[in-house]
Amino acid sequence: MTALNDGWFTEVFQDQGTAFSLQVKRKLHEEQTPFQKLEIYETETFGNLMVLDGCVMLTTRDNFLYHEMMTHPALFTHKNPKKVVIIGGGDCGTLKEVLKHPGVEEAWQVEIDERVTRMSEKYFPEPVSYTHLTLPTTPYV
């Protein structure tokens, strides 16, 4: 369950008895894609916030933490990673981290919802632009 009340976006986790809230300056974007509801907010302290179907996906301020932890443990424990496939990851943050590994020769990103990637280009440009500058031939499916 999520709510936007009195300038706060709140994601509530009833089963765990917890909630996560960010103070919102304004809503930047909202659309219903063929796959999910996509919302982008500008927050007071965490930069932009992406929400999919009411669930927080990333913020400008802390997205690197999520992507680093998803990527580096797997690639550092693999003997010699050369080819990587990322399922999802439309904001391109995981792809950005994968491309930091010099042994990776191919990286494929498969994202069902192109709108997530397009809105990431607009509102979270750093991970997306990094991936294009690092490996311009990276395929997006």
Locate the predicted segments by residue.
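N-terminal auxiliary segments of SAM/dcSAM-dependent transferases
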Residues: 2-44
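Single conserved hydrophobic/aromatic residue that forms the stacking wall/gate
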Residues: 132, 137-141
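A general beta-strand register signal
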Residues: 51-52
